[in-house]
Design a protein with these regions (language model features):
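Charged interaction scaffolds used for protein-protein
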Residues: 101, 110-113
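Negatively charged, low-complexity tracts enriched in Asp/Glu with abundant Ser/Thr
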Residues: 2-56
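Intrinsic-disorder-associated interaction segments
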Residues: 9-13, 17, 90, 94, ...
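Short alpha-helical scaffolding segments that buttress acidic/His motifs in well-ordered protein cores
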Residues: 114-121
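Short runs of predominantly hydrophobic/aromatic residues within well-ordered alpha helices
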Residues: 17, 72-76, 110
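Acidic, low-complexity, intrinsically disordered interaction modules
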Residues: 43-73, 77-105
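Low-complexity intrinsically disordered segments
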Residues: 124, 128-133
Length: 133
């Protein structure tokens, strides 16, 4: 299901935001010690572990190196997957949660707190610490 289809399941954007917030808090509380990006050395993925790019001299190109624990995505990736998001074309996106939601018609003031949670997670905080906003 595309993210737009997940959002459309709710009666309003406000309801979607409310459910997303509740589900992020639930996931962060249930997995409070989980550190998605240990050592602040990688970037966020909505569909897998944290990663970084490293130059491979043999290939003369950058390759993606996994730097986080095996999982199905960052806190927002996992939350939105739990809400039904499974579109393989959309999920590899590496942008911020703010950009994802702005691209779906949400307003900055509604999603500012989500960006703070994602920034905390991406800076090496445990999910329990990341949601304390």
């Amino acid at each position: 299901m595309k993210l737009s289809e997940v959002i459309a399941k709710y009666s309003s954007q406000d309801e979607f935001i409310s459910v997303l917030k509740s589900e992020v808090i639930k996931l962060g509380t249930e997995n409070s010690d989980f550190i998605y990006n240990p050592g602040f050395i990688g970037s966020c993925s909505y569909s897998g572990p944290a990663y970084r790019f490293e130059f491979d001299d043999e290939l003369c190109d950058y390759v993606q190196i996994v730097v986080g624990p095996e999982c199905k995505g960052c806190i927002f990736g996992q939350t939105m997957q739990n809400m039904g998001w499974d579109n393989e074309e959309e999920m590899p996106y590496f942008g911020s949660i703010s950009t994802v939601l702005l691209n779906h018609g949400f307003h900055d003031k509604e999603i500012r707190v989500f960006q703070e949670v994602q920034s905390n997670q991406d800076s090496g905080a445990s999910w329990g610490e990341a949601i304390k906003q």
